[in-house]
């Protein structure tokens, strides 16, 4: 029973202080569109960002990152898909550019496979940047369905529109389950705690 397992709602949230922009400025977001990214996830991510009038969005490729597009962005999103393929497509030089982007105070969000990519997970192709590690990776095909989560005190600051709810709901689809890494001394803040519900093929180890 992993009752203290922490779930990041399929997202890793890194360096979000950069998202507090001045009045009149829009948050400029780049969504990675490279090998391994699921096109549906890319489309849905873009559509979600377009709902917010205070944000602009564009897709970016490995070539764009190599050519300096990050200097014109405030945040990047790595979508779901195949994390190992995205890792290879980015390459070490571009991953270091992303690390420097985050070190400078900019924002980065990983969705599903993108969340795996940001972790410090032993034996997995990842960037070691967010202080968390994925567990139970041998059961990657663990299930999907509507799942509940509750926000921590820090999570309520980040998502004030959900702060009064004891439970909120999200469509979960085989994303990572994260705990604090024990191998790198990076800050790690839990924003939400997963509350497993009935899902197709859900693994009992995580309930």
Spans of model-derived segments:
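Catalytic beta-strand/loop cores that center a nucleophilic Ser/Cys/Thr
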Residues: 147-207
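Hydrophobic h-region of N-terminal signal peptides that target proteins for export
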Residues: 11-19
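Cleaved targeting-peptide boundary
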Residues: 21-26
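Helical hinge/lid and interdomain linker segments adjacent to catalytic or ligand-binding clefts
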Residues: 37-122
């Amino acid at each position: 029973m992993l009752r203290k397992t922490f779930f990041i709602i399929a997202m890793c949230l890194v360096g979000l202080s950069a998202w507090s922009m001045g009045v009149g400025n829009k948050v400029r977001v780049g969504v990675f569109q490279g090998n391994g990214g699921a096109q549906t996830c890319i489309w849905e991510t873009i559509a979600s960002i377009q709902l917010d009038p205070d944000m602009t969005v564009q897709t970016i490729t490995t070539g764009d990152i190599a050519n300096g597009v990050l200097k014109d962005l405030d945040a990047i999103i790595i979508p779901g898909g195949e994390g190992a393929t995205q890792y290879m497509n980015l390459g070490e030089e571009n991953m270091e550019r992303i690390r420097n982007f985050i070190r400078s105070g900019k924002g980065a969000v990983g969705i599903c496979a993108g969340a795996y990519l940001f972790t410090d997970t032993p034996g997995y192709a990842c960037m070691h940047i967010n202080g968390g590690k994925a567990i139970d990776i041998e059961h990657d095909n663990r299930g999907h369905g509507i799942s509940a989560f509750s926000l921590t005190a820090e999570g309520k600051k980040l998502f004030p529109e959900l702060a009064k709810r004891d439970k909120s709901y999200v469509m979960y689809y085989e994303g990572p389950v994260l705990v604090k890494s024990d191998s790198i001394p990076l800050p790690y803040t839990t924003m939400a705690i997963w509350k497993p519900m009935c899902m197709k093929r859900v693994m009992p180890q995580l309930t």
